[in-house]
Design a protein with these regions (language model features):
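N-terminal strand-loop-strand
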Residues: 1-39, 67
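Residue-level recognition of short, well-ordered coil/turn positions
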Residues: 125, 141-142
Length: 142
């Protein structure tokens, strides 16, 4: 899947394992955006990474999972959540149960879990922009 963007600040990726999403509980620290809320893997771009390279590196750093590009299902460019006037990339991918079972949780965040789509979309403990982006995907693939 080729994503045509050369200037972006970072990526988030919604990874579906069956009918659930892999989520990470952010640290409960003041001074970080959205403390103590559930979010999706991803983060800031390093160097001239492609969107997939950025997301894959972040997933490996956060969860110890190696992604391959054939896991990608969908992508869309959005305004950055952190940097006004900049863009970020949102990806949707699939994760196998074997990959989920092999997670080695890194040092960012308090924990991880598979969350149902309904809970992810309705919870007030999930980053709202990420809820909107998952909703966009679900609307488009109906």
């Amino acid at each position: 899947m080729e994503i045509e963007i050369s200037d972006f600040t970072g990526c988030k990726i919604a990874l579906f394992c069956g009918d659930k999403l892999l989520t990470i509980l952010r640290d409960n620290k003041s001074g970080i955006p959205f403390p103590n809320t559930w979010e999706l893997p991803g983060g800031g771009r390093e160097g001239d990474e492609s969107p997939f390279e950025c997301a894959a590196r972040e997933v490996y750093e956060e969860l110890g999972i190696h992604l391959t590009e054939d896991c990608l299902l969908w992508s869309k460019v959005y305004p950055s959540m952190l940097f006004e006037g900049k863009e970020s990339v949102f990806l949707i991918g699939k994760l196998t149960q074997e990959q989920f079972d092999s997670i080695v949780f890194g040092d960012e965040g308090q924990g991880y879990k598979l969350m149902s789509i309904d809970e992810f979309l309705s919870s007030d403990k999930v980053v709202p922009q990420l809820q909107d982006r998952v909703r966009d995907y679900l609307e488009e693939v109906k």
